[in-house]
C-alpha cells in the first residue's frame, strides 16, 4: 500500500513541476523595405527572412515600398520584442 502512495506522490509532483514551463503563442508583425514590391516578391522575402517563425503571411504597400510580414511565433516568455504582440498561453 505504501508503494501505491509513493507512486501517486511522484506522479503528482512531476505534473506540478512540469506545469511550470509555460509556452506562449504570439502574433507578430514586421516590415521589409524593397524597391518595387509585388505580391510574389513580398511572399518570397517574408518566407526567407522569417524562417524561424510559423504561419508567415504577407502583404504589401507599393506606395511605402515595404512588404509587411506577419504570423505567429511560439515563445517561452511573453515579453513583447521583435514586433511581437498579443501573446496567449498554450
From Swiss-Prot:
<keyword id="KW-1015">Disulfide bond</keyword>
<keyword id="KW-0800">Toxin</keyword>
<protein>
    <recommendedName>
        <fullName>U-scoloptoxin(15)-Sa3a</fullName>
    </recommendedName>
</protein>
<dbReference type="GO" id="GO:0090729">
    <property type="term" value="F:toxin activity"/>
</dbReference>
<keyword id="KW-0964">Secreted</keyword>
<dbReference type="GO" id="GO:0005576">
    <property type="term" value="C:extracellular region"/>
</dbReference>
<comment type="similarity">
    <text>Belongs to the scoloptoxin-15 family.</text>
</comment>
<feature type="signal peptide">
    <location>
        <begin position="1"/>
        <end position="18"/>
    </location>
</feature>
<keyword id="KW-0732">Signal</keyword>
Amino acid at each position: 500500500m505504501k508503494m501505491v502512495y509513493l507512486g501517486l506522490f511522484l506522479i503528482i509532483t512531476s505534473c506540478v513541476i512540469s506545469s511550470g514551463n509555460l509556452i506562449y503563442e504570439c502574433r507578430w508583425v514586421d516590415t521589409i523595405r524593397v524597391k518595387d514590391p509585388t505580391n510574389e516578391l513580398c511572399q518570397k522575402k517574408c518566407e526567407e527572412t522569417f524562417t524561424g517563425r510559423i504561419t508567415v503571411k504577407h502583404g504589401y504597400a507599393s506606395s511605402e515600398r515595404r512588404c509587411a510580414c506577419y504570423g505567429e511565433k511560439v515563445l517561452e516568455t511573453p515579453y513583447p520584442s521583435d514586433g511581437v504582440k498579443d501573446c496567449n498561453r498554450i
